[in-house]
């Protein structure tokens, strides 16, 4: 709620920040341009394969299921086998995730919790005329399917 100024998309910023904290080298491995569409996912997936054909990352985390559908399509076109050659995890757990090939592992974001938090924040902003920005955390859970299965 409210305006924020970040040097890049907040998810990309958070990903880079956590990678740095965990000592992961992600230089040249973050593809974060364009809309969250299947077509853009195909473009980003194709670009990743072209850029890293000789040394693919172990896995990719895709910001939204429609993008991930395109990434899976690009990998199939480029003969990159998921999950053998690269694992794919997405975010939102939309209905389409269970119908892709392979079925897409995706983080489910509690829509009920998100809606409740949004309504409470809106009510607070309206009654208190609050203009201070606020961040919140919403519960997620991984719905593991064929594109990525956590190891025990």
Labelled PLM ranges:
Residues 1-152:
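Bacterial carbohydrate/catabolite-sensing allosteric modules
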């Amino acid at each position: 709620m409210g305006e924020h100024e970040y040097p890049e998309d907040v998810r990309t910023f958070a990903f880079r920040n956590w990678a740095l904290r965990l000592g992961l080298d992600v230089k040249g491995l973050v593809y974060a341009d364009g809309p969250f569409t299947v077509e853009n996912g195909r473009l980003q997936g194709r670009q990743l394969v072209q850029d890293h054909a000789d040394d693919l990352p172990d896995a990719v985390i895709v910001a939204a299921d429609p993008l991930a559908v395109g990434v899976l399509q690009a990998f199939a076109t480029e003969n990159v086998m998921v999950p053998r050659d690269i694992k794919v995890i997405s975010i939102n757990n939309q209905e389409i995730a269970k119908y892709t090939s392979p079925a897409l592992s995706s983080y489910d974001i509690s829509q009920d919790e998100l809606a409740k938090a949004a309504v409470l924040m809106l009510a607070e902003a309206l009654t208190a005329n609050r203009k201070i920005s606020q961040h919140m955390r919403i519960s997620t859970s991984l719905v593991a399917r064929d594109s990525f299965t956590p190891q025990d």
